[in-house]
Every structure is written in C-alpha cells, then in structure tokens.
Regions:
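Active-site loop/oxyanion-hole signature of alpha/beta-hydrolase fold enzymes
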Residues: 14-15, 22-26, 34, 68-110, ...
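Helix-rich cap/lid subdomain of alpha/beta-hydrolase
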Residues: 146-199
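Conserved HGGG/HGGXW glycine-rich cap/lid loop of the alpha/beta-hydrolase fold
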Residues: 30-76
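The conserved beta1-alpha1 loop
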Residues: 43-45, 111, 242
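Catalytic active-site module of serine/aspartate enzymes centered on a nucleophile-bearing elbow/loop
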Residues: 263-295
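Conserved hydrolase catalytic core segment
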Residues: 104-149
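Alpha/beta-hydrolase fold catalytic core
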Residues: 1-40, 61-64, 103-104, 286-295
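Conserved serine/cysteine hydrolase catalytic core
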Residues: 206-259, 268
Length: 295
C-alpha cells in the first residue's frame, strides 16, 4: 500500500485530490495550499493550470506557505459559457481569495498569463485599493511588454473570427505540436506529461473556451500603459527569470525588461523555453531562493 501511494505522489490525480474548491461568483475554483512560512502565491499561465508548478511544489513548500489556484476557465476550475473572461476579473478572483484568507502581506510568483494578472494587482496596490501588501514579485516568461510578444500562429488564429471553430476543433496532435514549440531542448515533456496537459485543457469542456480566454492578448495592448507603468513605479523587489529559448516571450522580452524597468534584475536560463518551472525546476527554484535571500 505504501509503495502504491508513493507512486501516486506527483501525479495529476494526486494534485487534484490534494486540492480544495471554493466559490467565486457562483463558480467552483480549485486551489491548493501547503507549507509553512511567509505566504507565496503562484499564478499560472495560458492555456494550462496550477499543475505547471507541481515539479517545484516540494521545493517551495519546504520554505514557504504556498498557495495556488486554477483561474476561472482553467484546469480543474469551472469553465462557464457564456462568460466575460478578462485579466481584471482574474485579478478580482485573486484579490478576493487572498483577502478572504486574511493574508495581509504576500509574495507573488507568476508565469505567462499570471504575469498580466500580477501587473493588474500591482497597479491596484499603487492606487491604494488592494487590501493586502505585495512584498515581492518574481516573473517567469511573461508577455510583460506586448510590443515584443511573438504569438504562435495557433494563438493568432484563436484571436481571429475563426477562433471558435479553431478552439472547438483543436486536436490533441495540434495541441502537442504547438506546445512543444514553446519548449527548449533541455528537458522535453514525455507522453505522460502531454497526457496531463491535454487532460487539464479538455476538462469541463475547456477546449471550447480557448478563443474567449485568449482575449488577454488584446487586453495587454489596451492596458499597456497601466501595466508597464506599474512595473516602472514598483518599489518592492522584483526579478524576471527568463527561459531564453522561448520563441514567444523569451530573450526579446528579457531585453525589453532591462530597457524599461529601473534596476532590472534578470536571470536568464539557456536552453530553457516558455515553461522554466516545468522544464528546469531546480534552476528556477535556485534563482527564486537567491532572490528571496537578498531581501
């Protein structure tokens, strides 16, 4: 029995069974919490889920009180249709969740789509409307500056008038081909990894809403001044960890960060792509731990 349960640790089933659900606007949101120490909130990317962080979970929970959720429309959370999905709404979700837990100060560690949510939360803090304090921020391969974001063709198609057809007709093969393009050569996913990512994407008919979720690319352009301004005005410690082999938001994004963010702190990971925390978890953890020790 012990060996069987040991085998289950680290599986998608283990991840789901260790979670709890809460309600947001009448919709079920999946979350996980573990560890002791200062609260650390993990924010996942598109089109995946909190599962992206599972390889770092044992490392992070040894050091911090780690909290993560699947945003509305992602992973094991509800994926309502119709629904007006937006970065601002996801920020409302995090704001309500964090304040509801009674947390007064948190650290944020964000990837991709989660970086945009973090920028919105940071802007709210600077406006004095956030009910908690952001102590530090670490970004992972986020499209922080839309002018140097290079979306894949499939992402452009999802944004087009054909988006609904593309979303509903997305095959496992097409998904896997495009997903692998995002990754570096260091640690490619195996078949089980791709099974897990596909299961999360298709859970609760998630495939049918991708064209709604991807409106965030337009939101980034519309809110650029607000969200980039938030980075430039930030007073708390910030670090960007960049997998520079990422074709979408890798080396060019890191260069732009250095150009626009005062006292830019950037760690570049060679041969690592868009999912550094999945591809090279120990390197990302080392970079994050060093960042926190400097504070």
């Amino acid at each position: 029995m012990a060996s069987r349960s040991a085998q289950q640790v680290g599986t998608l089933e283990w991840w789901q069974q260790g979670g709890k659900w809460f309600s947001y606007e009448g919709h079920a949101i999946f979350s996980r919490m573990a560890g002791q120490g200062e609260p650390l909130i993990l924010l996942h990317g598109f089109p995946t889920a909190s599962w992206d962080w599972h390889r770092m979970w044992p490392m992070l929970t040894q050091q911090y009180n780690v909290l993560v959720l699947d945003m509305l429309g992602f992973g094991f959370s509800d994926k309502p249709v119709p629904y007006d999905y937006s970065i601002e709404d996801q920020a409302d979700l995090f704001e309500g969740w964090i304040s509801g837990l009674g947390l007064k100060t948190v650290h944020l560690f964000a990837h991709d789509y989660g970086c945009s949510v973090t920028q919105e939360l940071l802007a709210r803090e600077q406006e004095g409307t956030l009910p908690f304090r952001i102590a530090s921020i670490c970004f992972l391969n986020g499209a922080l500056f839309p002018e140097v974001h290079h979306p894949l063709l499939i992402q452009k198609l999802l944004c087009s008038p054909l988006g609904g057809l593309i979303s509903r007709g997305l095959s496992r093969r097409t998904f896997e081909r495009n997903f692998r393009r995002l990754l570096g050569p260091a640690n490619p996913p195996d078949r089980q990894d791709m099974d897990d990512f596909w299961q999360l994407l298709t859970y609760n008919n998630g495939r049918g809403i991708l064209h709604h979720l991807i409106h965030f690319m337009e939101e980034r352009r519309c809110h650029r001044n607000r969200w980039v301004g938030a980075l430039q005005k930030a007073t708390q410690p910030m670090r960007l960890v960049s997998g520079v082999a990422d074709p979408v938001s890798g080396a060019a994004m890191a260069r732009r960060y250095r150009e626009l963010v005062p006292n830019a702190d950037v760690v570049s990971l060679r041969n690592v792509g868009h999912y550094p925390h999945f591809e090279s978890p120990w390197d990302v953890f080392s970079a994050y731990r060093e960042f926190r020790k400097q504070q």
